[in-house]
C-alpha cells in the first residue's frame, strides 16, 4: 500500500494509548513518496505524519539490517508474511508513535514468535519544544534491539530476571551504537 503499513512494521500514532492504530496512517503520494513538513523548532503535534514516517523507516531499516546478519524468519523475526521460510508470521512490529501512555521513555514488548511485538515511543516534555523519540534513531534501534534479544533468548519469555534484563539493555545499546555508526 501507500501508507506506513508493511510486512515488517505497522507504524502509526497511538495518542489515546489504547494500543489501536490511530487512523488514517500517513499517506504517500501516488509515487510512494512520503514527504512531510518537519521543523525541530516545532512541537511534535505539528509534525505527526513526519514522525510516523520516520518511525516506519527506522523499523524497516533495522529489520533489513538485522535480516542480513541472521535475524531471519526461522530465527523469529518480525514479519506478517514469512514467505514459507520458517518461523511464525503475523507478527510485524506495531510501532506506536507519540504513544499517550507515557512520557520520557520508550519500550518494546516481545511475545513469542507469531505474536505481535509492540514498540511504544513517547514524547519527552520539558524542553522547548518537547521532543519526539520516534525521530531519534538511537532510541528506535535500541528498542528494536529488545525485540531481537527477547526473541533469541528464551523465545520471547527468556529475559525477565534482573541480570538478564540488564544484559538486554547493554545489547540494545550496542545495536544502536554499532549499527548507527557505520
Name each model feature, range by range:
Residues 1-182:
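Extracellular zinc-dependent metalloprotease catalytic-domain scaffold
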Amino acid at each position: 500500500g501507500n501508507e506506513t503499513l508493511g510486512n515488517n512494521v505497522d507504524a502509526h500514532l497511538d495518542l489515546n494509548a489504547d494500543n489501536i492504530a490511530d487512523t488514517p496512517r500517513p499517506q504517500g503520494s501516488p509515487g510512494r513518496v512520503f514527504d512531510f513538513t518537519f521543523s525541530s523548532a516545532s512541537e511534535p503535534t505539528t509534525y505527526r505524519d513526519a514522525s510516523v514516517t520516520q518511525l516506519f523507516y527506522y523499523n524497516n531499516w533495522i529489520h533489513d539490517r538485522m535480516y542480513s546478519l541472521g535475524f531471519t524468519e526461522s530465527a523469529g523475526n518480525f514479519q506478517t508474511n514469512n514467505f514459507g521460510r520458517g518461523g511464525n508470521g503475523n507478527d510485524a512490529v506495531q510501532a506506536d508513535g507519540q504513544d499517550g501512555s507515557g512520557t520520557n521513555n520508550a519500550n518494546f514488548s516481545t511475545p513469542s514468535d507469531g505474536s505481535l511485538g509492540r514498540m511504544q515511543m513517547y514524547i519527552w516534555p520539558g524542553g522547548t519544544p518537547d521532543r519526539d523519540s520516534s525521530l531519534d534513531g538511537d532510541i528506535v534501534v535500541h528498542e528494536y534491539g529488545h525485540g531481537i534479544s527477547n526473541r533469541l533468548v528464551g523465545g520471547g519469555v527468556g529475559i525477565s530476571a534482573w541480570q538478564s534484563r540488564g544484559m538486554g539493555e547493554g545489547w540494545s545499546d550496542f545495536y544502536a551504537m554499532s549499527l548507527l555508526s557505520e
